[in-house]
């Protein structure tokens, strides 16, 4: 069996109801810049939803860069995560981070979330 590193529609939270369900009693993993909220899902794979507020990241190209990096990191680490729905909340300070720095932070948060879910 080969592992697929694609990021398909099935790996995303799409509806407001899916997002809202994550906010009720979530498992949290956070840093100063990013918070991950997660709940178990009924799928066989993790799903992700991203929220990058204009209040914290003013310019569209900056919001897109942040979302692209987080999505790519999720795509590469999806097989290490349990079957959970994850909402990523981006806060102030993430704009100043370099791409590599953001990748490392998100990887650290995936591990933290995994430990909290399994532990």
Swiss-Prot record:
PROSITE patterns tied to this protein: RIBONUCLEASE_P
InterPro entries noted in UniProt: Ribosomal_Su5_D2-typ_SF, Ribsml_uS5_D2-typ_fold_subgr, RNase_P, RNase_P_CS
GO terms assigned for molecular function: 3'-tRNA processing endoribonuclease activity; ribonuclease P activity; tRNA binding
Coiled coil: none
Catalytic reaction(s) noted: Endonucleolytic cleavage of RNA, removing 5'-extranucleotides from tRNA precursor
Enzyme nomenclature, EC number: 3.1.26.5
Cellular component GO terms held in the UniProt record: ribonuclease P complex
Any single GO BP term: tRNA 5'-leader removal
Superkingdom field: Bacteria
tRNA processing as UniProt keyword: yes
Cited function: RNaseP catalyzes the removal of the 5'-leader sequence from pre-tRNA to produce the mature 5'-terminus. It can also cleave other RNA substrates such as 4.5S RNA. The protein component plays an auxiliary but essential role in vivo by binding to the 5'-leader sequence and broadening the substrate specificity of the ribozyme.
NCBIfam families: rnpA (TIGR00188)
Family stated for the protein in its record: Belongs to the RnpA family.
Subunit and partners: Consists of a catalytic RNA component (M1 or rnpB) and a protein subunit.
PANTHER family: RIBONUCLEASE P PROTEIN COMPONENT
Annotated protein name in UniProt: Ribonuclease P protein component
Lineage per the UniProt record: Bacteria, Pseudomonadati, Pseudomonadota, Gammaproteobacteria, Alteromonadales
Gene label: rnpA
């Amino acid at each position: 069996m080969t592992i697929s590193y694609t990021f398909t529609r099935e790996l995303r939270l799409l509806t407001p109801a899916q997002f809202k369900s994550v906010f009720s009693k979530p498992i949290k993993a956070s840093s100063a810049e990013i918070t991950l909220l997660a709940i178990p899902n009924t799928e066989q794979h993790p799903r992700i939803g991203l929220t990058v507020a204009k209040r914290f990241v003013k310019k569209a190209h900056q919001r897109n860069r942040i979302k692209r990096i987080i999505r790519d990191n999720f795509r590469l680490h999806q097989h290490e995560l349990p079957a959970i729905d994850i909402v990523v909340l981006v806060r102030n300070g993430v704009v100043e981070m370099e791409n590599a720095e953001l990748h490392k932070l998100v990887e650290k948060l995936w591990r933290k979330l995994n430990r909290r879910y399994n532990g």
